[in-house]
């Protein structure tokens, strides 16, 4: 038999709780009729990434953090396609739609591959909160599976 051990050692003021390292956000089954124009959105789903054991004391403490989400963009040149997270290239994938991640505080889109606005850290625990939804990149959205993946990284300041 085999036992695998995974993890990492980080030089950071906080650590991400294990349950938030890998999440699945259910955006549900959305009718194509919901997307009546370019930029139309599905109902949002909130999610968070909780940081724990935050130590923001000492000399030159790191008290702020940004997050960057990286993933495959929506194929093509539709409105906002490069800013959103693509739902796949398979023939069974939905077309002209992507997943948006927005900052819960301001409802501002966090563009694919671009760091977010700054979040302030609190001693102990801080939860970074977001909203996700499907967004159309063209006037006509075609049905299909709509699963996207985004990797995240944190930069402390």
Language model: regions and residue ranges:
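Mature extracellular/passenger domains of Gram-negative fimbrial/pilin and adhesin proteins
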Residues: 1-157
């Amino acid at each position: 038999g085999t036992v695998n051990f995974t993890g990492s050692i980080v030089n950071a003021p906080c650590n991400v709780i294990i349950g938030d390292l890998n999440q699945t956000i259910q955006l549900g089954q959305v009718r194509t009729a919901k997307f009546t124009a370019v930029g139309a959105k599905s109902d949002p789903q909130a999610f968070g990434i909780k940081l724990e054991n935050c130590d923001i004391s000492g000399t030159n403490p790191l008290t702020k953090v940004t997050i960057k989400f990286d993933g495959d963009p929506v194929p093509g040149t539709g409105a906002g396609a490069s800013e959103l997270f693509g739902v796949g290239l398979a023939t069974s994938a939905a077309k002209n739609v992507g997943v948006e991640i927005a900052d819960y505080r301001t409802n501002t889109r966090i563009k694919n591959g671009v760091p977010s606005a700054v979040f302030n850290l609190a001693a102990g625990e801080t939860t970074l909160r977001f909203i996700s939804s499907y967004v159309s990149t063209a006037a006509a959205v075609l049905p299909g599976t709509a699963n996207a993946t985004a990797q995240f990284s944190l930069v402390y300041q």
